[in-house]
Amino acid sequence: MTEIPSSFVLPDPEWIYRVGIGQDSHRFLPDEDPKPCILGGIIFENTPGFEANSDGDVVFHAICNAFSSVTHKGILGGLADELLKTKGITDSVVYLQEAVASLKPTQRVSHLAITIEGKRPKLLPQLPSMRKRIAEVLHIPLDSINITATSGEGLTAMGQGYGVQCFCVLTIMEYCRY
């Protein structure tokens, strides 16, 4: 049997980690459409918005889906659709706030890793603003979030400029007495 080195620190046995994976994608509207392009809660000028019933923020939608994979509560396609039908709410910030509220009192967001693929808009200049906005909505430190962006070298519809897709991995810490 292999011995565990004394320098190896085991995690506190009262904390367990849950990992959620989220994805979303939307096609761009025609260039002349006035709907704004919103990603990570930030408006991108000179880029059309997305075909969606909501504001189409694929970053916030992917994060919502990651929360759903941890909490088992349908935010998109469930609660978001209900908010749209009954109150006309299309703001993905509200959907993400509901996702955060779906956590148990014993759960906390530990880390969020985001990857965005698309030919447009140019994301790099806005990544700090996006991280800040996401941190505000999730109530977590800025250094708990990272965003990478890729064009995908034009190999997918997203990389060819037809839309944007986002993947994310959400790590939740849960206090659990055994």
UniProtKB/Swiss-Prot annotation:
The record marks N53, S151 as: Transition state stabilizer. The keyword Metal-binding applies. Its EC number is 4.6.1.12. It is an enzyme of class 4 (lyase). GO terms for molecular function: 2-C-methyl-D-erythritol 2,4-cyclodiphosphate synthase activity; metal ion binding. It catalyses: 4-CDP-2-C-methyl-D-erythritol 2-phosphate = 2-C-methyl-D-erythritol 2,4-cyclic diphosphate + CMP. The keyword Lyase applies. 4-CDP-2-C-methyl-D-erythritol 2-phosphate binds at D24, S25, H26, T150, S151, G152, E153. One of its GO terms (biological process) is terpenoid biosynthetic process. A divalent metal cation binds at D24, H26, H61. Binds 1 divalent metal cation per subunit. It comes from the Bacteria. Belongs to the IspF family. Homotrimer. This is 2-C-methyl-D-erythritol 2,4-cyclodiphosphate synthase. It comes from Chlamydia trachomatis serovar D (strain ATCC VR-885 / DSM 19411 / UW-3/Cx). The lineage of its organism: Bacteria, Pseudomonadati, Chlamydiota, Chlamydiia, Chlamydiales. The gene is ispF.
